[in-house]
Amino acid sequence: MQKFGSLLFPAALKEKSAGKKIAFIALFTAFSAVTNMFLEVKLFDLQFSLTVFVSVFTGVFLGPVFGFCACFLGDLVGYFVNSWGQLYFFWVGLSTGLTAFISGVVTAFKTEKKGAIYAKIAIICVLHLFVCTIAVNSTGFYLYNKAMGFSKPLLDYVAERFGGNADFFAYLCYRLFFKGQIINSAFNYALLFDAVPLLSLN
C-alpha cells in the first residue's frame, strides 16, 4: 500500500494538502498546454518541440498517474486552443501521457547508488523511444497514412531505399531519419541529462 502511495504521489507532493495537490496538477496541465500551443511546430506527422522534456518533468513531479492525466489533458487543451489547422490525433496525447507515466514509475524507485539518476534517465529515454515514439506515435501515423493514402515523397523514399513496399519499418525510417523526428527526440534527451539531475531524484 505504501509503494502504491509513492507511485500515486511522489515525495514532493505526498505531504501537501489536497488543495495544493489539485493546484499543482492544474499548474502542470496548463504548463503542458502552453508547451503544446507555443513551444512546438507541427508538420502533420512530425513534431518539433520540448514536449518530451516537459512531459518527463511532469511525470517526475506529479507521479505516473497524475502526470499522465496532466499531459494528456494538456495536449488536448493545447490542440483546441491552437490546432495549427490540423486534425486531432489522439495517439499524440496518449504518447505524451505515457511519457509522463513512464517517468513517474521509473523515478519512483529510490536508490542510494551513485549515478543512479543517470541510469534512470537513460531508461526513460529508451522506453520513450520504443514505447511512445515507435509503438504509439509512429504506429498511429502509419495506420492513418495507410488508410488515407501515402504521400508521394514517402512513396519515392520507400521506392528508392526499400524497393517500393511501404511497410511499417520503411515508414518508421522515413519519419525518424529522413524527416528528422529522431533529432527532436535526441535534443530532448540531451536536455534531460542536463537538467533532471538538478532535481536530486536518486
Where do the language-model regions lie?
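Loop-helix junctions at membrane interfaces
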Residues: 1-202
